């Protein structure tokens, strides 16, 4: 055999010395790697869609490790959908089980903020050749990752609305005892109407009710590292819905700053970033760490104090940071739940308990705990497909009109149709004036007896006497005949009109459902405001009758305001009046001691108990001069401003309503309040000409109407003019396989994520990237640590039978 080898070398003409033959295995290994890479790409990037004549494929949205998703159009209705193809779905047990799990969960869920299955294509090939699964889903133009990391405007209202929809869907999911485990922006699908749907349930699990289920929970765990909860990284063995709330907090922070909150390069770096913000975990958390080396590593670090969220996100909304702080806690039990987060003041604008449903019954994960073979999983998936179509056909039969009137056109209507007409002379005469009773005798058979000659029954067998005014038998017969005649005429004129099947109902889009919910919420708020308005009117009438003895002169009458806004407006009205100096330090001329009611000049002190009785604009000029200074310029008070005139609380309200420019926010003195008027001039000097007092009342009413209007309106955030194209990750196709395979086979993983690749390699759904990025560590140690914290990779290349060992 040595001869042919030498001849082969001679034919090659390389002329290399025999010592260079050692490089041949390297060349062979590289060829095997290239072959395996080409094979994996061919198996995963199979974009040939065999969907029959019902759907028309438009374009490919994205592809990944688990499948390919394309947009399509249904030929019958023109509706656009997304079709996800899972090629070779039964080759790997892990991927087959993932497909079965996702089908079962999505069939169980029916929620506006969760991706829904519209159809599952039946296999068109024999059972033995069935390999690819086609699932028809809602079509969403983009995902939240593309929105955040693009030039698309993202306001605080967008963030609030996205977060509300995410928590609304999460509340429904958690009520079914389902934990998503892989929430990230690319798994949240978004359309141009700012509607959000949660997708990719392939890694979902149920709640762990016993320690024996912890291993099941961590099986095939693939949470993206940047959104991974601490209990999963530290192996705290406390796996609850709080895992998803941590991911929601990371997504929330990413929306606020449009950058990732904890972009760790590897496992250790991820822990460091979390502790830099949240500080060192409590001793209880450290003692609960399941991995000994991880516990020793955390204890070796110097203690750190938590950083205030105002420092992490300077200038962000305080209520938003309050909610963010309640989501991101080391202790899972200390995190806020989805239901409680919906009640947070930051989401009060959209919160509606009647429109935030729960899921019943809970989802059953019993099938997922069984050790299933590929053949059993295939049988289960085929059974799920048939069950989906059986349910849909059953629903169609329930809503379809039954053809109960169809036989009427060809068959006799009923025996009553042959009754004689009510206008027949013989029948009516016999019934109204029956002949005298005849003696019983043998006559013809009962079926041949003439009704007109039959004797009347005895009096004892007659029906009870009819009440006066009741409908007679003749009238009943006439009505019956008229109805039957009308029915026959309708059948004769248009026999197919009542039998036509109703035209198919136009499918209701998600946007129409959202409009219905907003209209329902608006009507509910209007009814609540009307009730509050009537209650306030009753209170004003009672207060006016008890104090003034006449009709109320409240300028806020008829307007709907909350108690807080009303109190602030009343304080503002008092501040709009000329300030009253304190009696003690007033340098005004001394009043006459002999007067029972001393008068004072315009700048003199006024009793504080008399000031709030009437607004400044309603006091007559001559009569009110001894009590209140004249309207117009506001004099500078000689003493300190009384406590009720402090303007700090009202400043925040007025600024938040955008009624005044920011430049009108100086100190808290009473003369500084005048710039807050929407149309008023700057505060005049005491020596200038007085302004008429009637100009103050319209300003207060205008502000009141604006505040009242803001209590009723519930505007949605502006729609997106153009959404960036999504990657398809939210449909559960997995991470970008081409880039991942190139990096994995070349062993050329960079130290960190490259620019423009924020959601690909570093956001892959496998811990294999963590192992490859662990520079400076022995691979055996990394694998040992991975086993210790019970986190396995779902993508085992050895499961593929076609791959060759290099």
From Swiss-Prot:
Region: May not be required for kinase activity, residue numbers: 407-806
GO cellular component: cytoplasm; cytosol; nucleus; PML body
Highest taxon listed in the record's lineage: Eukaryota
Catalytic activity, reaction form: L-seryl-[protein] + ATP = O-phospho-L-seryl-[protein] + ADP + H(+); L-threonyl-[protein] + ATP = O-phospho-L-threonyl-[protein] + ADP + H(+)
Pfam families linked: Pkinase
Cofactors: Mg(2+)
Binding site for ATP: 61-69, 84
Region feature Required for binding to MAP2K5, mapped onto this chain: 78-139
Motif TXY boundaries: 219-221
Extent of motif Nuclear localization signal: 505-539
Enzyme class, first EC level, given as a word: transferase
Keywords: Acetylation, ATP-binding, Cell cycle, Cytoplasm, Differentiation, Kinase, Nucleotide-binding, Nucleus, Phosphoprotein, Serine/threonine-protein kinase, Transferase
Renumbered residue ranges of the record's region Disordered: 1-23, 424-475, 488-727
Biological processes annotated in GO: calcineurin-NFAT signaling cascade; cell differentiation; cellular response to growth factor stimulus; cellular response to hydrogen peroxide; cellular response to laminar fluid shear stress; cellular response to transforming growth factor beta stimulus; ERK5 cascade; intracellular signal transduction
Principal subcellular localization: cytoplasm
InterPro entries reported for this sequence: Kinase-like_dom_sf, MAP_kinase, MAP_kinase_CS, Prot_kinase_dom, Protein_kinase_ATP_BS, Ser/Thr_kinase_AS
Keyword Membrane applies: no
Keyword Cytoplasm: yes
Region (Necessary for oligomerization) residue spans: 140-406
Localization per Swiss-Prot or TrEMBL: Cytoplasm; Nucleus; Nucleus, PML body
Regulation: Activated by tyrosine and threonine phosphorylation. Activated in response to hyperosmolarity, hydrogen peroxide, and epidermal growth factor (EGF).
Subunit structure and binding partners: Interacts with MAP2K5. Forms oligomers. Interacts with MEF2A, MEF2C and MEF2D; the interaction phosphorylates the MEF2s and enhances transcriptional activity of MEF2A, MEF2C but not MEF2D. Interacts with SGK1. Interacts with PML. Interacts (via N-terminal half) with HSP90AB1-CDC37 chaperone complex in resting cells; the interaction is MAP2K5-independent and prevents MAPK7 from ubiquitination and proteasomal degradation. Interacts with STUB1/CHIP; the interaction is enhanced in the presence of IGF1 or MAP2K5 and promotes STUB1/CHIP E3 ligase activity.
Task of the protein: Plays a role in various cellular processes such as proliferation, differentiation and cell survival. The upstream activator of MAPK7 is the MAPK kinase MAP2K5. Upon activation, it translocates to the nucleus and phosphorylates various downstream targets including MEF2C. EGF activates MAPK7 through a Ras-independent and MAP2K5-dependent pathway. As part of the MAPK/ERK signaling pathway, acts as a negative regulator of apoptosis in cardiomyocytes via interaction with STUB1/CHIP and promotion of STUB1-mediated ubiquitination and degradation of ICER-type isoforms of CREM.
The name this protein goes by in its record: Mitogen-activated protein kinase 7
Native source species: Rattus norvegicus (Rat)
């Amino acid at each position: 055999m040595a001869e042919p080898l030498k001849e082969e070398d001679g034919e090659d003409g390389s002329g290399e010395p025999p010592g260079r033959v050692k490089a041949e295995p390297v060349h062979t290994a590289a060829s095997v790697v290239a072959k395996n890479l080409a094979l994996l790409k061919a198996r995963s990037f199979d974009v040939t869609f065999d969907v029959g004549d019902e759907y028309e494929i438009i374009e490919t949205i994205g592809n990944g490790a688990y499948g390919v998703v394309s947009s399509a159009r249904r030929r019958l209705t023109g509706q656009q959908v997304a079709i996800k193809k899972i090629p070779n779905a039964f080759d790997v047990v892990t991927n087959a089980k993932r497909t079965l799990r996702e089908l079962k969960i999505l069939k169980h869920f029916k929620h506006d903020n969760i991706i829904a299955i519209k159809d599952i294509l039946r296999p068109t090939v024999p059972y033995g050749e069935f390999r690819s699964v086609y699932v028809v889903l809602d079509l969403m133009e983009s995902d939240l990752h593309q929105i955040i990391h693009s030039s698309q405007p993202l306001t605080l209202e967008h963030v609030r609305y996205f977060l509300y929809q995410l928590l609304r869907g999460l509340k429904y999911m958690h009520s079914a005892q389902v934990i998503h485990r892989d929430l990230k922006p690319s798994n949240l699908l978004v359309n141009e109407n700012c509607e959000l749907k949660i997708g990719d349930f392939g890694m979902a699990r149920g709640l762990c009710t016993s320690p024996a289920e912890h291993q099941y929970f961590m099986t095939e765990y693939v949470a993206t590292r940047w959104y991974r909860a601490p209990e999963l990284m530290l192996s705290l063995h406390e796996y609850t819905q709080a895992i998803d709330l941590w991911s929601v907090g990371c997504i929330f922070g990413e929306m606020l700053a449009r950058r990732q909150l904890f972009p760790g390069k590897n496992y250790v770096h991820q822990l460091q970033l979390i502790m830099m913000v949240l500080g060192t975990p409590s001793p209880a958390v450290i003692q609960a760490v399941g991995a000994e080396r991880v516990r020793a590593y955390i204890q070796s670090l110097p203690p750190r104090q938590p950083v205030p969220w105002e420092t992490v996100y300077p200038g962000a909304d305080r209520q938003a940071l309050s909610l963010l702080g309640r989501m991101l806690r080391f202790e899972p039990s200390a995190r806020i739940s989805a239901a409680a987060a919906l009640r947070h003041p930051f989401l009060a604008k959209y919160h509606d308990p009647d429109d935030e449903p729960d899921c019943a019954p809970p989802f059953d994960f019993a099938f997922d705990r069984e050790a299933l073979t590929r053949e059993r999983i295939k049988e289960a998936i085929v059974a799920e497909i048939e069950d989906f179509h059986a349910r849909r056909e059953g629903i169609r039969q329930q809503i379809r009109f039954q053809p109960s009137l169809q036989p009427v056109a060809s068959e006799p209507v009923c025996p009553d149709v042959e009754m004689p007409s009510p206008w027949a002379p013989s029948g009516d005469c016999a019934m109204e004036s029956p002949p005298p009773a005849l003696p019983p005798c043998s006559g013809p058979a009962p079926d041949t007896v003439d009704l007109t000659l039959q004797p009347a029954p005895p009096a004892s067998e007659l029906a009870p006497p009819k009440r006066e005014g009741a409908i007679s038998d003749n009238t009943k017969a006439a009505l019956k005949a008229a109805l039957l005649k009308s029915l026959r005429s309708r059948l004769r004129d248009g026999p197919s009109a009542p039998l036509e099947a109703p035209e198919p109902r136009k499918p209701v889009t998600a946007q129409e459902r959202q409009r219905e919910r907003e209209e329902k919420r608006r009507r509910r708020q209007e009814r609540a405001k009307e009730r509050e308005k009537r209650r306030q009117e009753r209170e004003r009438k009672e207060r006016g009758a008890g104090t003034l003895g006449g009709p109320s002169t409240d300028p806020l009458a008829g307007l709907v305001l909350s108690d807080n806004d009303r109190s602030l407006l009343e304080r503002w009205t008092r501040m709009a009046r000329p300030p009253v100096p304190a009696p003690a330090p007033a340098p005004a001329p001394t009043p006459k001691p002999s007067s029972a009611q001393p008068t004072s000049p315009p700048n003199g002190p006024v009793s504080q108990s008399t000031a709030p009785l009437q607004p400044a604009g309603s006091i007559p000029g001559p009569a009110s001069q001894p009590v209140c200074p004249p309207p117009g310029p506001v004099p500078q008070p000689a003493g300190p401003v009384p406590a009720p005139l402090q303007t700090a609380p009202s400043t925040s309200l007025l600024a938040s309503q955008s009624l005044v420019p920011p430049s009108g926010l100086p100190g808290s003195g009473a003369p500084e309040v005048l710039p807050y008027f929407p149309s008023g001039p700057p505060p005049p000097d005491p020596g200038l000409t007085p302004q008429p007092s009637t100009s103050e009342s319209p300003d207060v009413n205008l502000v009141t109407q604006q505040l009242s209007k803001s209590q009723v309106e519930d505007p949605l955030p502006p729609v997106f003019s153009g959404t960036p194209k999504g990657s398809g990750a939210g449909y559960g196709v997995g991470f970008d396989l081409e880039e991942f395979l190139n990096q994995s086979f070349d062993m050329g993983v960079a130290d960190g994520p490259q620019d423009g690749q924020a959601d690909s390699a570093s956001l892959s759904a496998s811990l294999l990237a963590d192992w490859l990025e662990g520079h400076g560590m022995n691979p055996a140690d990394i694998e040992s640590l991975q086993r210790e914290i019970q986190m396995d990779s779902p993508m085992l290349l050895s499961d593929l039978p076609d791959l060759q060992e290099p």
